[in-house]
Amino acid sequence: MFNKMLVAIDGSDMSAKALDAAVHLAKEQQAELSILHVGREAVVTTSSLTGIVYVPEHFIDEIRNEVKKEGLKILENAKEKAAEKGVQAETIYANGEPAHEILNHAKEKGVSLIVVGSRGISGLKEMMLGSVSHKVSQLSTCPVLIVR
């Protein structure tokens, strides 16, 4: 039924549950599994007094490198966890807006199922901000499993 799966992880407890579910399904379905982590770009806001903030380029590069280093560590741990259960997985690191990157990689890979963790936000906050899982479920062209 599902021959290619993509699970998105961010190091949270919910994404760990999503990974467990994806590994279980991939093993059961004998499906290919891709594990995706999206590192967000650092956001710099301006000062309300001057309207200008100077951030040295090397500092921004250091932040990007640390974000990527942490993301690669999360991916490596996830790959090891999958291997322990007998599932070989590929890992993908991307930068950008998580929902957008998840959908792009799902389309690129031709996946038949996307697995994401629920962020657990609800009510007004979700209505105002939205959640990655909600955006992915609304915009995906393939089934999405949201794990709680």
From Swiss-Prot:
* Signal peptide as annotated in the record: 1-18
InterPro entries assigned: Rossmann-like_a/b/a_fold (IPR014729), Universal_stress_UspA (IPR006015), UspA (IPR006016)
Keyword line:
Signal
Spell out the Gene3D superfamilies in the cross-references: HUPs
Identify the domain of life: Bacteria
Query: What would be one Pfam family of this protein?
Result: Usp
| Similarity comment text for this entry | Belongs to the universal stress protein A family.
The cross-references to PANTHER family, in alphabetical order and at most eight, read: STRESS RESPONSE PROTEIN NHAX, UNIVERSAL STRESS PROTEIN UP12
Which named protein is this? Universal stress protein YxiE
Which source organism does the UniProt entry give? Bacillus subtilis (strain 168)
